[in-house]
Curated annotation (Swiss-Prot):
Protein name per Swiss-Prot or TrEMBL: Na(+)/H(+) antiporter NhaA 1
Catalytic activity: Na(+)(in) + 2 H(+)(out) = Na(+)(out) + 2 H(+)(in)
Molecular function per GO: sodium:proton antiporter activity
Naturally occurring in which organism (per UniProt): Erythrobacter litoralis (strain HTCC2594)
Domain of life of the native organism: Bacteria
Membrane topology summary: Multi-pass membrane protein
TM stretches of this protein: 20-40, 68-88, 105-125, 134-154, 163-183, 186-206, 214-234, 263-283, 301-321, 334-354, 371-391
Length: 405
């Protein structure tokens, strides 16, 4: 029997439920958060926004983290990196990166999609050593944002292209983590690094000896985070390290890794990343003229995201398919592949994160970087969406098609 009270409510809220279980929801939330941050940062609340995130905390358990912005970027974002690490490990063991055939094209695309934007960036900023440090900013792709834009197109986009974009973004995240660890580590403290590696070894041992309960891993991971924080390596790397030690052994049909990923992914996508976005996307534009928008740094980042990403990824796909190195995504044509390549130029979360590491001593450069990131990501999103919207059709209207070498 249909409940006369719940049925109308259920129908009324059906669109809302559909939105939050769709690919688009996390991306739409990020767009709203970024817009809110910009509005607040340019309103009478700008002073309160600045004080909230950058004002000294009255008390902090770790003196090194003396404002809320640092706690978000070094602490809360470790959860995001932990989820990324879980996803990467699962994909490498039993997912879309588990065999050479499956990972060839995404790996090639991700490498080219990081290298070419970096080259474009350096080409624009030239020999300015202060700006060159930001070479990795346009090299990252925001999974939630890009998949969100793709989700707005519904079933018009072939499933193979969704899978390709997701896999490229995952490999991209691996590259970004390696870049952060290798190039954005300052004042390395060897003793703390040794301690961190020792704790990591303990977590590996816990896995090997069959520890399958979550709390031991969480407690040891917190100690690992503190050690990495004081080692000089960015603290969020502890999240990836901890994730790699979580067991993939299946009990009652699900592994601890899968349970953690399933449980934490929504919190990461709908709480952690939006908080990070709100804390980092706000730029006060008062006093900024056209010269600031057209300065070398924002232009270099925007060019890297809009031009470099699509040039690198689409170019390597064409080359790999023509040379017979890899197969293109099934049931997709070249224009659709190009459209998805453009969407990889959406670099919101990781790009903002890297900009904070690259220009730690200059709020001006960080603000200029934010303008380039937001502008480049917005252009990539609109351009990619428009091309795909105009060239794709619903499955029932779609003739069988594949790209030919």
């Amino acid at each position: 029997m249909v409940d006369p009270i719940r049925s109308p409510l259920s129908r009324a809220f059906a669109p809302v439920r559909a939105l939050f279980v769709s690919d688009a929801s996390a991306g739409i939330l990020l767009i709203l958060v970024a817009a809110a941050a910009m509005i607040v940062a340019n309103s009478p609340l700008a002073g309160a926004y600045e004080e909230m995130f950058y004002g000294d905390l009255a008390w902090t358990p770790i003196a090194k983290l003396d404002d809320l912005h640092l706690w978000i970027n070094d602490g809360l974002m470790a959860i995001f990196f932990f989820v990324v690490g879980l996803e990467v490990k699962r994909e490498l063991i039993c997912g879309q990166l588990s065999s050479p055939e499956q990972r060839t094209l995404p790996v090639l695309a991700a490498i080219a999609g990081m290298a070419v934007p970096a080259i474009v960036y350096v080409g624009v900023v030239g020999t300015d050593s202060a700006l060159v440090r930001g070479w990795a900013i346009p090299a990252a792709t925001d999974i939630a944002f890009a998949m969100g834009v793709l989700g707005l197109l519904g079933s018009r986009v072939p499933a193979s292209l969704r899978l390709f974009l997701l896999t490229v973004a995952i490999v991209d995240d691996i590259g970004a983590v390696l870049v952060i660890a290798a190039f954005y580590t300052a004042n390395l403290k060897v003793m703390w690094l040794v301690i961190a590696l020792g704790i990591f070894g303990v977590m590996v041992g816990m896995n090997k000896f069959g520890v399958d309960r979550i709390w031991p891993y969480i407690l040891v991971a917190l100690v690992l985070w503190v050690a990495v924080l004081f080692s000089g390596v960015h603290a969020t790397i502890a999240g990836v390290m901890a994730a790699l030690t979580i067991p993939m052994r299946r009990k009652d049909g699900h592994s601890l890794l899968e349970k953690l990923e399933h449980g934490l992914a929504p919190w990461s996508a709908y709480l952690v990343v939006p908080i990070f976005g709100f804390a980092n996307a706000g730029v006060n534009l008062s006093g900024m003229g056209l010269d600031a928008v057209l300065a070398p740094l924002p232009l270099a980042i925007a060019a890297g995201l809009v031009v470099g990403k699509q040039l690198g990824i689409f170019g390597i796909i064409v080359a790999a398919v023509k040379l017979g190195i890899a197969k293109a995504p099934a049931n997709a044509n070249w224009i659709e592949i190009w459209g998805v390549s453009i969407l990889t130029g959406i670099g919101f979360t990781m790009s903002l994160f890297i900009s904070g590491l690259a220009f730690t001593d200059s709020r001006l450069l960080i603000d200029e970087a934010k303008i380039g990131i937001l502008g480049g990501s917005l252009i990539s999103a609109i351009l990619g969406y428009t091309i795909l919207r105009l060239t794709t059709t619903h499955p029932e209207e779609r003739p069988p098609q594949t790209v030919t070498p």
